[in-house]
Amino acid sequence: MLTARRPSHTLDMRSVSIPFWLRGNYDAMTFFGSIVTHSQAEAERYNQLTPQYQSSKLPAQSSKLKEWYHPVKYHETIHLRQAQSVHNSWLCFYWKYFLFWFQARRANRILPNAGYELNPFEMEAYANMYNPYYLDRFPDGRATGWKDYARMTLAQRFYARRKYSPKENS
């Protein structure tokens, strides 16, 4: 984990169990190309999933879809593709993530976890984590849907977030 490669060099995000890193209701966290989980059992389950992220490589049967798809791992994979779209750098991705988080904290009086729930990166990931073909929309594999959310005002993001609910989806 401490010798992270560029996001474009990461084909499959390995999962590790570091339970004290995750607070609250978070199921997992992306950390420089790895997925941090609550338990070793979750980490092993995510590590057993086959890394196939292009629908052209996927079998048509839904039973085969279960061999590689899990919403939480896909959510974290969307973060990997977002990092590729931010100068292909984990540091740039986390810097932008922090800036969006800090900006959204102004809405904490209305929404207790606003820094997280109104973050454009999280909004894109939550809105699309149940669509296993979402990343196919981007020919170069870089998820850029977060840019649409970033152009919105905080009020627009607040109302747009009602289309999904991170607490219900996690």
Predicted segments — roles?
Residues 75-76, 122:
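Acidic active-site catalytic centers that drive phospho-/nucleotidyl reactions
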